Regions:
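Exposed, polar/acidic Ser/Thr-rich sequence context and nearby capping/turn residues
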Residues: 1-169
């Protein structure tokens, strides 16, 4: 008597968990013509294996165009952008700034079971004033792409940044 057993294997892959970082993040307001201001930070940790983070999109509450310029991505060995000497700029990926997003793609960021720390850093346009409409960055797990598995952690909501002119102007 032969019997057949059907086995369904699940290859869900690892879970990548995002968490917000607040140490070293710039306070509001952002001042015209200032540089290298960390506007959002997050960590990414894999439950197993080494999936790659290949893309993510930071949403903005209003357009960041003509407010945030020279946007960069940094990684750090600790969870603070303020710590001197341990922040390294990531290069070699594609970046686009739209009316509602900061889009990072073609990334090859290997993740692991140890948290990896990321900071979105920008210069502040010289033309912003106290009348410039505020902008608030955010990151949802749905806007993060990994090579395998899934992403969890909810929404990371940054500071609602007002703007101001440089002191003495």
């Amino acid at each position: 008597n032969a019997s057949t057993v059907n086995v369904t294997a699940s290859a869900a892959g690892p879970t990548v968990t995002l968490a917000q970082l607040t140490a070293g993040i710039a306070p509001s307001p952002l001042v015209a013509s200032t540089t290298d201001k960390a506007i959002l930070g997050f960590s990414a940790t894999s439950s197993a294996g080494t999936p790659s983070m290949t893309a993510f999109n930071i949403g903005t509450s209003t357009t960041s165009v003509s407010k945030l310029t020279n946007v960069k991505l940094y990684t750090s060995t600790d969870n603070s952008y303020a710590t001197a000497g341990d922040n390294v700029q990531i290069t070699g990926f594609a970046f686009a700034q739209t009316a509602t997003q900061l889009q990072f793609s073609a990334l090859t960021e290997a993740l692991s079971t140890s948290a990896k720390y990321y900071f979105i850093v920008a210069d502040i346009d010289a033309t912003v004033t106290g009348a410039t409409v505020a902008v608030q960055p955010s990151l949802t797990n749905a806007n993060v792409t990994v090579s395998s598995g899934s992403v969890t952690g909810g929404t990371i909501t940054g500071t609602n940044y007002a703007f101001d002119v440089a002191a003495g102007t």
